[in-house]
């Protein structure tokens, strides 16, 4: 895991439901925790593009449902402001299920991946078809 150049807005609080954009069998997941989040007392932890989160699978194959797994946020609907002044936002909030060390469990990612997530997680960048 590397540091990222820009600092996107934290837009996904605990409890947010996201699309799972890989071929592991999960379709929809819910964020239940954010790794390495240092916040304020009584404030919900929130995630942004490139963060590792802990998710539970809400919709998917019977083998995947109800499992608690680590995942990385690859897209968010809230716009990301980059250091060069450009702004990027996506049509949905999406995650990719990964191993605890950050390598993707699936072999394919559907849709684009934010540049911030690809820079931070080389394993995700390897299997991404489109990096924006």
From Swiss-Prot:
GO terms for molecular function: large ribosomal subunit rRNA binding; structural constituent of ribosome. GO terms for biological process: translation. Keywords: Ribonucleoprotein, Ribosomal protein, RNA-binding, rRNA-binding. One of its GO terms (cellular component) is cytosolic large ribosomal subunit. Pfam families: Ribosomal_L14. It comes from the Archaea. The keyword Ribonucleoprotein applies. Binds to 23S rRNA. Forms part of two intersubunit bridges in the 70S ribosome. Part of the 50S ribosomal subunit. Forms a cluster with proteins L3 and L24e, part of which may contact the 16S rRNA in 2 intersubunit bridges. HAMAP family: Ribosomal_uL14. PANTHER family: 50S/60S RIBOSOMAL PROTEIN L14/L23, LARGE RIBOSOMAL SUBUNIT PROTEIN UL14. Belongs to the universal ribosomal protein uL14 family. This is Large ribosomal subunit protein uL14. It comes from Methanocaldococcus jannaschii (strain ATCC 43067 / DSM 2661 / JAL-1 / JCM 10045 / NBRC 100440) (Methanococcus jannaschii). The gene is rpl14.
